[in-house]
């Protein structure tokens, strides 16, 4: 009998060391399976240890946190012209690893943003503030079992992020993000910082 998975991960007090991790780049096309086979579209980033040196040493598995996107003005989810930042912030869950069910030979970073987009955003700049770990990477006997676990990952990420210590300060979230508290205690300023500002 399968062991029941926890519905929430991480302490109420907020992310613990070594988190958060930061990752950024332009959204690239992946294997084309997220939407077609799984019904769970992904926005992928290149795995580049020269940009994200920590990625070589962390476990392959499922992580969660916040993603910010710099969408073109023509995109339906693009921020209004009155917004102080070109970035919009959404909750996300992501896989870092080889996806053994598909026998991948290269490590990938596949991000599922927890929002239903009405248009693609390939090549858009994306930043990730990775706050915690959900589970190890594993193989599956069937596609159905894989999809079930991914959907559970999404639920765990939503619930885990919907706490005051995990929600960014300053009302940074896109208006469509459904959380109880729109303003939390987490420093998420890097997610929306202009490109010409110094990094933290």
Swiss-Prot record:
Positions annotated as active site in the UniProt record: 110 (nucleophile)
InterPro entries: Riboflavin_kinase, Riboflavin_kinase_bac/euk, Riboflavin_kinase_dom_sf
EC id: 2.7.1.26
GO-annotated cellular components: mitochondrion
SUPFAM superfamilies, sorted: Riboflavin kinase-like
Gene3D superfamilies, alphabetized: Riboflavin kinase-like
BP-aspect Gene Ontology terms: FMN biosynthetic process; riboflavin biosynthetic process
EC top class named in words: transferase
GO molecular function: ATP binding; metal ion binding; riboflavin kinase activity
Region spans: Disordered: 1-20
Keywords for this protein: ATP-binding, Flavoprotein, FMN, Kinase, Magnesium, Metal-binding, Nucleotide-binding, Transferase, Zinc
Pathway field: Cofactor biosynthesis; FMN biosynthesis; FMN from riboflavin (ATP route): step 1/1
Family: Belongs to the flavokinase family.
Function: Catalyzes the phosphorylation of riboflavin (vitamin B2) to form flavin mononucleotide (FMN) coenzyme.
Identification of the protein by name: Riboflavin kinase
The organism of origin for this protein: Pyricularia oryzae (strain 70-15 / ATCC MYA-4617 / FGSC 8958) (Rice blast fungus)
Lineage: Eukaryota, Fungi, Dikarya, Ascomycota, Pezizomycotina
